[in-house]
Amino acid sequence: MKTDIHPKYAPVVFRDLASGATFLTRSTVSSSKTIEWEDGNTYAVIDVEISSESHPFYTGKQRIMDSAGRVEKFNSRYAGFGTKK
């Protein structure tokens, strides 16, 4: 097995910009920005725009779209498609 070919795998803090939530995990990404974590250690921080803390699917605040109008519009538009004239 080759040595020194894999990226550095280290603890990283991800910060959700939408909700302000932060969580510590391990990743190969790196950042020049750092943050002091609850355990007193300093870790690289990666800002993400959306995570499971703020995504509508995971928070239960999703909107259910009424697709009936879209289906009817599609059917009316392509009602005669494929028929010989």
UniProtKB/Swiss-Prot annotation:
Extract the SUPFAM superfamilies matched here: L28p-like
Q: Which GO terms describe its cellular component?
A: ribonucleoprotein complex; ribosome
Q: Which UniProt keywords apply?
A: Ribonucleoprotein, Ribosomal protein
* InterPro entries linked: Ribosomal_bL28/bL31-like_sf, Ribosomal_bL31, Ribosomal_bL31_B, Ribosomal_bL31_sf
- Keyword Phosphoprotein in annotation: no
Protein's UniProt keywords contain Plastid: no
* Gene Ontology MF, one: structural constituent of ribosome
Q: One Pfam family from the UniProt entry?
A: Ribosomal_L31
Q: Name one GO biological process term.
A: translation
| Matches recorded under NCBIfam families | L31, PRK01678.1
On assembly, the entry states: Part of the 50S ribosomal subunit.
Similarity annotation:
Belongs to the bacterial ribosomal protein bL31 family. Type B subfamily.
* PANTHER family on file: 50S RIBOSOMAL PROTEIN L31, CHLOROPLASTIC, LARGE RIBOSOMAL SUBUNIT PROTEIN BL31C
Protein name, UniProt field: Large ribosomal subunit protein bL31B
Species source reads Clavibacter michiganensis subsp. michiganensis (strain NCPPB 382)
Name of the coding gene: rpmE2
